[in-house]
Amino acid sequence: MKLEAWERFKRIALSQPSQESSPGSKGPEKREKVVTALIVDSPWIPGFVGIPTLDYFTLSEEWIKANIYIEERFPEVVFLPGYWMEYGMGAEPSAFGCSMKWWKNSPPSVIPAIHETSEIARLKVPDPEADGLMPLILHLYEHIEKSVNKQKSHIKMVAARGPLATAAHIRGVTEFLVDLKLSPDETKRLLEITTETAIRFLRAQINHLSEVEGILLLDDIVGFLSPRDYLEFAHPYMTEIFSSFEGMVKVYHNDSKIDHLLEPLAETGLHVLNFGFNVDMEEAWQRVGHKIRLMGNIPTIEILAGGTPEEVKLHAAECIRKTGGGRGLILSAGGAVPPDTPARNIDALVEAARS
């Protein structure tokens, strides 16, 4: 991304909400205009620029051109993580032996690798430099960073799937959630492995690139847990990951329903929470807006992809209103940008932030 855009995002992400800007306060606050940021990746980018998804994954020059184009087309949007080298959900699970089905015009499907909890005992933390798709990502990052820099742009953030998301792909989502209750010890061992995997993969990306200042962790499965199960099976592992990257901007994405987990999530060490439209922005702001920055939460499919520009502006205005005029808000979708999202609706989001 452009340095100016990154510095603007980082400044807001790391700023400490002052007493005057806290929810419920009436004091004045000197603040910047609302920043627009969007998580974008292979479900949206190839279709938007008019190339097959397989070309996007396999032809590095097409990948570079596509990412440069969206940045130039929407100069006021901070795209996260920005120039994201990914293969759908496949990078981390592939290192555990998960097979993948590839499609011409959509991201690959991941097939679970283990079918009994007894198989967890044989799993080891993979080497990002050698196992699965991770080494390909690392090698490509070194290649593409030079091309990105020639465009006076920069790769400032890297991403990884969270420990529960990776575990659920290795085991199967339903099976993983059942294991939480029936085989808690084996499940915790799996989560220890996937937690260390996320840490090592993020560190490897940081080491292969030259300018990284932020991490993005994505894990929707966390929202499927009760508060009690969250504290046992998610909170320690999330906290371990975020605490491993001191000095980095830490963004967490979860667009499942997490209104029952807002307070403990805010204590994991994250700076920015991107959450779904199924959580009320005003409630989230009142409860944790004094601790973290909120990023959201326009309905993705119904409004950002399928609505009119006027509907996008209306929902954006509500997000701004519900956060006291945009205090602590990074205006965004309630999740990643979905397929078929038109340019006019992203333009409308930017216009709403401007006003």
Language-model segments: which ranges?
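Membrane helical hairpin/interfacial module
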Residues: 67-92
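A contiguous, low-structure linker/loop signature
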Residues: 84-126
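Active-site loop segments of alpha/beta catalytic cores
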Residues: 1-56, 63-66, 80-81, 102-109, ...
